[in-house]
């Protein structure tokens, strides 16, 4: 069974691109357009890893991860933060992020970081 990764980004093009990269590498991918939708998805099925944008409407990525970390009923879920602004990764590291990637996303960096932090990894394709 492929590792399940949840992608959270308000930009549909970014969501599609990340799904393409991750699914092509053999991961199962869930997509959420904001942190509110992602929260419901996590409660329904906890992913092995979350890739989330920092700047989103309603609730930013930092607030989303802080809410996850505050819920003791949820398992620890590794998080990779995405941002288009190089404003440092201090807040993300405080929340226990395993990585911080600048947009535009390089597929090789994304996949390497995911592989380092997902138990079980992808399912071989073909």
Task: Give residue ranges: language-model regions.
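Active-site T/S-Asp motif of two-component receiver
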Residues: 10, 51-53
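Receiver (REC) domain active-site loop signature in two-component systems and cognate sites
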Residues: 56
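Hydrophobic/aromatic residues positioned on beta-strands within the core alpha/beta folds
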Residues: 80-82
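Short hydrophobic/Thr-rich beta-strand motif most characteristic of the beta2 strand and flanking loop
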Residues: 26-33, 41
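Active-site beta3 strand of CheY-like receiver
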Residues: 45-51
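Acidic catalytic/metal-coordinating carboxylates
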Residues: 34-37, 60-66
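Alpha4 helix (beta4-alpha4-beta5 surface) of REC/receiver domains from two-component response regulators
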Residues: 63, 85-102, 109-112, 116
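Charged docking surfaces used in two-component/phosphorelay signaling
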Residues: 16-24
């Amino acid at each position: 069974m492929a590792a399940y990764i949840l992608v959270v980004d308000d930009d549909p093009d970014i969501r599609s691109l990340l799904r393409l990269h991750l699914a092509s590498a053999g991961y199962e991918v869930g997509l959420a357009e904001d942190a509110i939708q992602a929260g419901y998805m996590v409660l329904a099925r906890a992913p092995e890893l979350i890739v989330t944008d920092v700047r989103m409407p309603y609730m930013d990525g930092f607030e989303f991860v802080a809410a996850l970390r505050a819920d003791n009923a949820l398992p620890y879920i590794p998080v990779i933060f995405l941002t288009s602004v190089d404003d440092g990764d201090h807040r993300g590291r405080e929340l226990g992020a395993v990585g911080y990637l600048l947009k535009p996303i390089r597929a090789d960096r994304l996949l390497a970081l995911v592989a380092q932090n997902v138990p079980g990894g992808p399912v071989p394709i073909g």
